[in-house]
Design a protein with these regions (language model features):
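Juxtamembrane membrane-interface segments at transmembrane alpha-helix termini
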Residues: 81-82, 109-114, 133-143, 157-166, ...
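Amphipathic alpha-helical coiled-coil "transmission" helices that mediate dimerization
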Residues: 192, 199-253
Length: 253
C-alpha cells in the first residue's frame, strides 16, 4: 500500500494540509463529497448506540439507569448533528461537531467500562467507536488521532479514579492503542487518497480550461478567416461585374 505519492509530496506530513490556497478549495470539495455520508452515518450510529442499551439490561442491571442516561445524552447529540446537517451552517463547523460527538461517544463507553471493567462487551464497544471514527463519519486524520489518544488518556485516568485493576487497564490500553493505530493508518491513507484525487481534479479542470480556451481561439480564427474569405469573395464578384461592364461598354463602343 502506498502512503505517499509524488503528486502529494507538497502536503504537510502531519496535518496533510496543502501549503497554499488549495487547502480551502479542498475542504469545500471534501465537504461536498462527504456530508451526505456523514449524515447517514450519524443516523445509523444513533440507532446502534441506542440499540446496545438492550445489552445494558442484560449485563449491567445494577447500572442500567445510569447507562441509559449516558446513551440518551449521546444519542440526542448524534441526532442533533444529523438534523443540523440539513442546514447551510453545517459546512462551517461540521468537522468540529464530528470531533466533539466522536469524543463524547467514546467517553460514554469509557464510563460504562470503568464501572464494569470485567464485562468485555464495553471494551469491544469502544473499539467499534474507534472504527466508526476512522472510516465512517468522515473525520479527518489529525482530528481522529487527537481525539482517540485523548480517549486513551481519559480511560487511564478514569481507571485510576475508579480503582480498576491495573492488569485490566493495561490489557485494554494495548488493544485500544492497536485499534487506534490501525484506524490512523486507514484514516491517513484515505485522506492522502482523497487529496490525490482532488489534486488530479484540479489538473484536469486546468487542462479543460486550456482546451476550451484553445477551442475558442480556434473558433475565433476560423470566424476571422471566414469573414476574410467572404470579403475576398465579395471583392472578386465586384471585380467580375466591373470587368463584365467594361467589356460590355467596349463591345457597344
Amino acid at each position: 500500500m502506498v502512503f505517499w505519492t509524488e503528486l502529494t509530496n507538497q502536503l504537510n506530513r502531519v496535518t496533510l494540509n496543502f501549503p497554499d490556497e488549495r487547502e480551502k478549495e479542498y475542504r469545500d470539495f471534501y465537504f461536498v463529497r462527504s456530508y451526505k455520508t456523514t449524515r447517514v452515518a450519524y443516523l445509523i450510529l444513533a440507532l446502534l448506540y441506542a440499540f446496545f442499551g438492550y445489552l445494558d439490561s442484560v449485563v449491567a442491571r445494577q447500572y442500567f439507569d445510569l447507562f441509559i442516561i449516558i446513551r440518551v445524552i449521546v444519542v440526542i447529540t448524534l441526532l442533533f448533528v444529523f438534523f443540523y446537517s440539513y442546514l447551510n451552517k453545517f459546512r462551517i463547523n461540521w468537522q468540529t461537531l464530528i470531533f466533539i460527538t466522536y469524543f463524547l461517544g467514546a467517553v460514554g463507553i469509557i464510563l460504562m467500562l470503568v464501572m464494569l471493567p470485567e464485562v468485555v462487551v464495553y471494551s469491544s464497544g469502544l473499539i467499534l467507536v474507534f472504527l466508526a471514527g476512522s472510516v465512517l463519519i468522515k473525520l479527518r486524520f489529525l482530528a481522529f488521532s487527537i481525539a482517540s489518544w485523548l480517549v486513551i488518556v481519559i480511560y487511564v485516568i478514569a481507571g485510576i479514579l475508579w480503582k480498576v485493576d491495573y492488569s485490566i487497564v493495561l490489557s485494554n490500553v494495548f488493544f485500544f492503542a492497536g485499534a487506534i493505530i490501525i484506524g490512523m493508518i486507514a484514516a491517513y491513507r484515505t485522506e492522502v487518497f482523497n487529496r490525490d484525487n482532488f489534486n488530479l481534479y484540479l489538473q484536469i479542470a486546468k487542462k479543460n480550461v486550456q482546451i476550451e480556451q484553445a477551442n475558442k481561439n480556434l473558433e475565433d480564427k476560423v470566424e476571422e478567416r471566414t469573414k476574410l474569405l467572404n470579403f475576398r469573395n465579395k471583392e472578386l464578384k465586384e471585380e467580375v461585374k466591373r470587368r463584365a461592364l467594361i467589356e460590355k461598354e467596349l463591345i457597344t463602343a
